[in-house]
Amino acid sequence: MRGVTETDKLANGIFHLVCLADLEFDYINPYDSASRINSVVLPEFIVQGVLCVFYLLTGHWFMTLLCLPYLYYNFHLYSKRQHLVDVTEIFNLLNWEKKKRLFKLAYIVLNLFLTIFWMIYSALDDYED
């Protein structure tokens, strides 16, 4: 479950960057790019919330603490209604959006590696007992 949601978020982040790169190189129009990105934003937020709750319920406190800043950031964007990409502003904010998505992608990759590490550590610890 943990690895699946982390890889879903990773694929989602890569999808966002590909859409923005396609827009930058004029392979896609702004409306299509914004609608593609906006269609996966809320599922990304839901997956992050479920993952954080899953870590909390299973007693993985360290991973819960690592997921909380990203969850807070997503909640903050959603509450200020800044979570969706605006079609009319997408060209003006293209570099900022790409930087934001790259930072989120790096954060997700770090969480993925830590999740894999803790799964292997837990499996080896159970094997020794």
Curated annotation (Swiss-Prot):
Keywords in alphabetical order: Membrane, Transmembrane, Transmembrane helix
Keyword Membrane: yes
SMART domains, per database record: Cornichon (SM01398)
Highest taxon of the lineage: Eukaryota
One biological process term in Gene Ontology: vesicle-mediated transport
InterPro entries, sorted: Cornichon
Location in or out of the cell: Membrane
Topological category with respect to the lipid bilayer: Multi-pass membrane protein
GO cellular component, one term: membrane
Chain ranges passing through the membrane: 45-65, 105-125
UniProt record similarity statement: Belongs to the cornichon family.
Protein name: Probable protein cornichon homolog 2
